[in-house]
Structures are given as structure tokens and as C-alpha cells.
Amino acid sequence: MDVYQISCDLRPGVRDAEFVTALNAYLGSLKKTGRIETWRLLRRKLGLGIPALGEFQILIETRDLAQLDEAFKAVSTRNEPVEGAHHGVNSLVTNFQAALYRDFPDPHRQLGEERF
């Protein structure tokens, strides 16, 4: 699995429940149409964490980069209904950062022949 990780904070005045509702609508639609496998929302607890990483973490899982690319293509059309759902989330957040991770070790990896 590949994991697209998003870190963000809420814009001033945005309620956390409003953010959750918008995120459910947006990522729920991507999951329902098979563009992502699953997603999770995490929130910093007890104020612990690296401030630069934001209060919220969104973990979006895809089977592989091909599925993630299809999700990006769907969103980048800027057509409804995905555009409205994407804007519904994007307009609520600030300090957006993203990263891409994979399960490790890779399931196809062979051990013993590495040269480094």
C-alpha cells in the first residue's frame, strides 16, 4: 500500500466538526468510487507533536501509485461533484503539507542480493 499523508491546521474560526463533515464527503466519495482504498483522520493529542506538522494528519491509502494517480486525475478535472467536495475541505485548512510513504519492506523485495 502507498500512503499519501497530509498535515494541516484548521483556519481560524473553523470548527473541527465542520472539517470532519467536509472530509467525510470528499474522501468518502473517492473511496466509494474506488479511487482510494481507505483513509484516516488523526488529531494531535494533549498538544504533543511537532508543531510544524500541523494538528491534523490525514492518511490516504491506495493499492499503488497507479490508483493514487487516478485519484489525482479525478480531482484535477476540477469538475463537479469532486471539485465542490475538494474545495469544501481545502477552504477550511491552512499550513498544508503532504508526503508519500509505502509499506516497507516491499512485498516483492528479495533479500540477500543487495549490494549496498
Can you annotate each of these PLM segments?
Residues 1-2, 49-52:
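Short, flexible turn/loop "capping" segments at secondary-structure junctions
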Residues 6, 19, 23, 58, ...:
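Hydrophobic pocket/interface hotspot
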Residues 109-115:
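Short, charged, intrinsically disordered terminal tails
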Residues 10-13, 63-64:
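Structural beta->alpha junctions
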Residues 2-9:
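Active-site-flanking beta-strand signature of metal-NTP-handling nucleotidyl enzymes
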Residues 29-37, 51-55, 59-104, 115:
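An amphipathic, aromatic/His-enriched active-site/gating alpha helix that lines ligand/cofactor pockets
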Residues 14-41:
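Short amphipathic alpha-helical segments
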Residues 42-48:
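Short, solvent-exposed loop/turn elements at beta->coil junctions and helix N-caps
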